[in-house]
């Protein structure tokens, strides 16, 4: 046991001496200074944020041009579509396609004249209504 005691004393004394060397006297804490607040203002000019709204006029001659109109709507531009120079069946297909596009982007489509439609994305609000010629006199029929 003498050997074990010597090892224990040797290791315990060494550990004790290490602790004494690491001990430091307490220092006075520095006074906490208040944080400086930035003098930035969070004001942004509305003119720099708001882009000028655009309205696109479209007069498709073939059904394939409906995709270009849909691209304008996806770019958040309002589109007035004149379908007077296209065959009636193709005009119906274009209106169906644009109705789906407008629904998908959360917009609106309104008929503003005979075969003339206003398609708007969700960022454009339309107020008011336009009555078509003789609309009040006869029962409503699908164009």
Swiss-Prot record:
Keywords: Cell cycle, Cell division, Cytoplasm, Septation
GO cellular component: cytoplasm
Pfam families membership: SepF
Subcellular location as annotated: Cytoplasm
Primary residence: cytoplasm
One annotated GO biological process: FtsZ-dependent cytokinesis
Classification via InterPro entries: Cell_div_SepF, Cell_div_SepF/SepF-rel, SepF-like_sf
Function: Cell division protein that is part of the divisome complex and is recruited early to the Z-ring. Probably stimulates Z-ring formation, perhaps through the cross-linking of FtsZ protofilaments. Its function overlaps with FtsA.
Family to which this protein belongs: Belongs to the SepF family.
Subunit relationships: Homodimer. Interacts with FtsZ.
Protein name: Cell division protein SepF
Source organism per UniProt: Geobacillus thermodenitrificans (strain NG80-2)
């Amino acid at each position: 046991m003498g050997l074990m005691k010597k090892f224990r004393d040797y290791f315990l004394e060494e550990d004790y001496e290490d602790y004494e060397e690491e001990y430091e006297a307490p220092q006075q804490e520095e006074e906490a200074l208040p944080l400086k607040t930035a003098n930035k203002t969070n004001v942004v000019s509305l003119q720099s944020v708001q882009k000028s709204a655009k309205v696109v006029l479209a007069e498709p001659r073939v059904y394939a041009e409906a995709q270009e109109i849909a691209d304008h709507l996806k770019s958040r531009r309002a589109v007035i579509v004149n379908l007077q120079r296209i065959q009636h069946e193709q005009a119906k297909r274009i209106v169906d396609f644009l109705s789906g596009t407008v629904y998908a982007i959360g917009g609106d489509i309104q008929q503003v004249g005979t075969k003339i439609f206003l398609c708007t994305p969700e960022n454009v609000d339309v107020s008011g209504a336009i009555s078509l010629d003789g609309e009040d006199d006869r029962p409503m029929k699908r164009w």
